Amino acid sequence: MQPIISFEQFTFQYGHAAQPTLSDITFHIYPGEKVLIAGRSGSGKSTLAHCINGLIPFSYEGNSTGNVLIAGKDPREGSIFEQSKQVGTILQDQDAQFIGLTVEEDVAFYLENECVKQDNMKKIVSDSLRKVKMHTFHKQSPHELSGGQKQTVSLAGLLTTNADILLFDEPLANLDPLSAIHTIELMKDIHEQYNKTIVIIEHRIEEIFKLDLDKVILIDEGKVIAMGTPKEILASNILPRIGLREPIYIEALKRLHFDSNNDVIYPMENLQKEKVSNVIKEWMEKQVILKRNAKNKELLKVENLSFSYPNKQKVLENVNLLIYEGEIVALLGHNGAGKSTLAHSLIGINKMKNGKIALKGEDISSWSIRKRGEIISYVMQNPNHMITQPTVFEEVSFTLTLHNFSKEEIKNKVEGILKICGLYPFRNWPIQALSYGQKKRLTIASVLTTNPKLIILDEPTAGQDYYHYKQFMSFIKNLAKKGISFVVITHDMNLALEYTDRAVVLHEGKIIADNTVFDVLGNQETLQRANLRESSLTKLIKFSGIACPEKFMELYLDSTRREEGA
């Protein structure tokens, strides 16, 4: 069988770059395979994806050597239009992919360009939407859909093209746990029904491995450094060395000194249950529970907060919440549960229907957005949506300039904040020269100028690889030690487990759980009601038959935090 994607000694260098982004790339993907291409940020995996779908060389210019064949043809000798018939791409940013005003218009876009007759077009669009179970949404605007639904509509559009290769660019990056599971199941269904070749660019290893991949290709510093089945990749212990995360239950087994020389540790069901149980019991007996510090002073108190949009049912109903100084709280729940609405109510964008918000006992419910914004800051998921100035120094000093601080005061304050955030060496850099992670820290630096007491972070680690994820969350932990409180809106259960002090779960506008993270995420009923994903760590404990999984999670998290100095 001939490969459908073939790279041999392929090197690519952007026109403006001093060094090649891809060097001596060689691999083959065969028809019908499901393949993951993974690597940390900046590894070259996105450039490789662009070489597959034709964006290189037709949208991004550069110089290449070596051989590349997609469906038997060299894409450099054709056109991006021809390439799009062979390779269908689903972008990480779904909104950037939509053309039509309604779902059916968007799915019909390719067919319209092919001048397909209208009657036939309607049938193809209807069939494509039925294949992905989105036919009842055909008249809706794409922008009214959830992240998972948008991705599904994009896939329906690709099915109209009959492309043999489906390329997914970080398909799980912006999805809640339920939508991520749905997306993976949808990929499986499409593969089983149509035998498409599926190529995925992703660094969320644990989730995407559920797709039953045929092959994993690891990229680092522009080179292929490993290739094999998921089992072979996990057995090699290479993932942590290149800044990617192993499944958290495998991390746990290694921390427990589980001897896996004669065991296959992936998937979990292959483990010897009795051996796992004994190792966990022995480890637990040696552990000492950390003495819990008394809670800090109360910072913010929310009482009976309700909110509804005009002519709609309540989005928040009788929400009661306490936040303490220096505390990191995870705000969890599926898309539409009310997390963003609650955040917008705290910062004053939403005018609450009833209820009260108090800061250290003072009622701030009637405060203006500007006044409230000086003590409660909101950091968006995408840093590019917040940054307005051309350089790092100008961005951080912007608010101080508006408040008429003197040049000397601005210089001293900004430089101090940049040092705290690890950005002082880059103070004169242009914004476009910063990495994504540096931009995330820059948005934090900008809000620190007002000395906020509480910072709300919306999906702070979305789109970041594990190395930058750990770096950013350690930075947040250090700020919390200085007394700043954080509310972290996240779909990442591992982040909640490892870095937050408490978890609050919203469901249909109501708080259904508010407790320590290991109590909340160890509660199966809460997870099911809120459509949250159970951590593989709790699955491991259930698999082992150990009683009191919450107890193990408490001991394990205490241990990891001691090791990391958190």
From Swiss-Prot:
Subcellular location field: Cell membrane
Residues the record lists as binding ATP 2: 333-340
Gene Ontology molecular function, alphabetical: ATP binding; ATP hydrolysis activity; ATPase-coupled transmembrane transporter activity
Task performed by this protein: Probably part of an ABC transporter complex. Responsible for energy coupling to the transport system.
Record keywords, A-Z: ATP-binding, Cell membrane, Membrane, Nucleotide-binding, Repeat, Translocase, Transport
Gene Ontology CC terms, in alphabetical order: ATP-binding cassette (ABC) transporter complex
E.C. numbers: 7.-.-.-
Protein's UniProt name: Putative ABC transporter ATP-binding protein BC_2655
Keyword Membrane recorded: yes
Record-stated family: Belongs to the ABC transporter superfamily.
EC main group: translocase
InterPro entries: AAA+_ATPase, ABC_Co_transporter, ABC_transporter-like_ATP-bd, ABC_transporter-like_CS, ABC_transpr_CbiO/EcfA_su, ECF_ABC_transporter_ATP-bd, P-loop_NTPase
Residues the entry annotates as binding ATP 1: 39-46
Annotated PROSITE patterns: ABC_TRANSPORTER_1 (PS00211), ABC_TRANSPORTER_2 (PS50893)
Membrane topology note: Peripheral membrane protein
Chain ranges of the ABC transporter domain: 5-246, 300-533
